[in-house]
A protein has these predicted regions:
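Acidic, low-complexity proline/glycine-rich segments
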Residues: 4-7
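N-terminal, positively charged regions that mediate nucleic acid binding
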Residues: 9-49, 54, 61-67
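Short coil/turn connectors at secondary-structure junctions
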Residues: 13, 17, 76-79, 115-119, ...
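A short glycine/serine-rich beta->alpha loop
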Residues: 20-26, 86, 149-152
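Glycine-rich, N-terminal phosphate-binding loop and its surrounding beta-alpha-beta segment
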Residues: 48-51, 55-60, 64-138
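Hydrophobic alpha-helical hairpins/lids featuring a short glycine-rich hinge
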Residues: 126-161
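Globin-like tetrapyrrole-binding proteins
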Residues: 164
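Conserved small/polar residues in nucleotide/adenosyl-binding loops
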Residues: 167-168
Length: 168
């Protein structure tokens, strides 16, 4: 622990809690909206394919219950990078989705500091790895037969929310 943290006098008990919050127009908010829009488009397309009875060339039918999406987006000056692992039978145009979100937010001119029509959009999305799929589809406890608790049966992959606190 740093000396700076040790020197903070405790208030209302002896812990320090911190969190991040960003304001309107922050690149993190734009990035989250792009990732959400990619997932929404994939789910909508997968449902459409499922209703049509689509079966992929590898013999796997479209099924919205089988969609897995770990989509992360980075937004910086003039550039959007969308990356991650996705399991779906659907194809969506990531570049079009990203530009549409940016346009809807209002970044449609270079004089605004970001232009939906001229920014670079890179899609680095690939198929979900078997290792990640294993952890998402079935929890470790399910795979080893060590639990029957319904909560413990749910797989989690590599996603999680962290909450950190410090106590004296």
């Amino acid at each position: 622990m740093s000396e700076e943290l040790r020197s903070i006098p405790p208030k209302h008990g002896s812990f320090v809690f911190t969190s991040e919050s960003v304001t309107e127009g922050h690149p993190d908010k734009i990035a989250d909206q792009i990732s959400d829009a990619v997932l929404d488009a994939i789910l909508a397309k997968e449902i459409e394919l499922q209703e049509q009875g689509y079966i992929a060339p590898n013999g796997v039918p479209a099924n919205v219950e089988n969609v897995r999406c770990a989509c992360e987006t980075l937004v910086t000056t003039g550039t959007v990078i969308v990356a991650g692992e996705i399991r779906t039978q659907a194809y969506v145009d990531v570049q079009e989705i990203a530009r549409g979100v940016i346009r809807r937010i209002g970044y449609n001119r270079a004089k605004f500091g970001f232009d939906c029509d001229t920014c670079g959009v890179m899609s680095l999305i690939h198929e979900q790895s078997p290792d990640i799929a294993q952890g998402v589809d079935e929890s470790f406890e399910t795979q080893t037969g060590t639990t029957t608790d319904p909560i413990d049966l749910i797989g989690a992959g590599d996603q999680g929310m962290m909450s950190v606190s410090y106590t004296h």
